[in-house]
Design a protein with these regions (language model features):
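Polyanion-binding surfaces on beta-sheet-dominated domains and ring/shell assemblies
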Residues: 2-190
Length: 190
C-alpha cells in the first residue's frame, strides 16, 4: 500500500511539472518570427526616441561628473517637454540637520510607457553654491542680505536645497526610464 502511494505522488508531481506554463505566441511556438520582428522594431523605436530626446538638450544641460555625462534638471525638463508621457509622482523628502547645514534626500515615483522607477535625489547646503567656500557667502549670504534674518535665510536655503534635490531626482528618473544611464561622451558626440 505504501509503494502505491509513493508511485501516485510521483505521477502527480510529474503532471505538475509538465503543466508549467511556457512563453508562447498564439500558435504555441516559443520564439516566433513575429516575436523577433517586434523586438527588433522596439529596439529601433527606442533608438529613435533616445536620439530625439538628446536633440532637445542644449550644451549646458549636460555636465561632466567624474568623466561621465550627467543630464542636469533643466535638460530633463527639456526632454520631458519633447517626449510626452512621463508621469511624476509626489516627492517625499527626508531632511537631516547637522548644524549649520541641511541634508535633503527625496524619492519620487516616476513612470514612462509602463516602466516605473522610484527616482532618488539629494542635496546638501554644505555645497559651496549655498554657503560659499568660506561658509558665509553664496546663496545664504544673498538671502541674509535680502531678509536681514538668519532664520529666514536658513529657511530659504532649505527650500533651495529641496528644489535641487527634486531636480536631481527627476533628472535621474528621466535618464533611467529612457535608458540613458551609462552614456559616454563618444555616444553623445555621435
Amino acid at each position: 500500500m505504501e509503494e502505491k502511494t509513493e508511485v501516485q505522488a510521483e505521477i502527480v508531481q510529474k503532471k505538475e511539472m509538465a503543466t508549467v506554463s511556457q512563453i508562447t505566441d498564439s500558435g504555441n511556438v516559443m520564439l516566433s518570427e513575429i516575436y523577433i520582428e517586434n523586438a527588433a522594431k522596439q529596439i529601433e523605436f527606442r533608438a529613435r526616441l533616445i536620439q530625439t530626446a538628446l536633440k532637445a538638450l542644449k550644451p549646458h544641460d549636460i555636465q561632466d561628473f567624474d568623466g561621465k555625462p550627467y543630464i542636469e534638471g533643466e535638460g530633463a525638463a527639456r526632454i520631458m517637454s519633447v517626449i510626452r508621457g512621463f508621469k511624476v509622482g509626489e516627492a517625499k523628502f527626508v531632511i537631516e540637520t547637522i548644524h549649520p547645514h541641511y541634508f535633503v534626500e527625496t524619492s519620487i515615483p516616476m513612470e514612462f510607457m509602463g516602466a516605473t522607477t522610484v527616482a532618488l535625489g539629494d542635496c546638501s547646503t554644505a555645497d559651496p553654491f549655498f554657503c560659499g567656500k568660506d561658509g558665509k557667502s553664496g546663496q545664504y549670504k544673498k538671502h541674509l542680505d535680502r531678509t536681514g534674518s538668519e532664520a529666514m535665510s536658513a529657511r530659504l536655503i532649505l527650500g533651495d536645497a529641496k528644489k535641487k534635490a527634486r531636480e536631481n531626482a527627476i533628472s535621474r528618473g528621466v535618464t533611467e526610464l529612457l535608458g540613458l544611464k551609462g552614456l559616454s561622451w563618444t555616444i553623445l558626440a555621435d
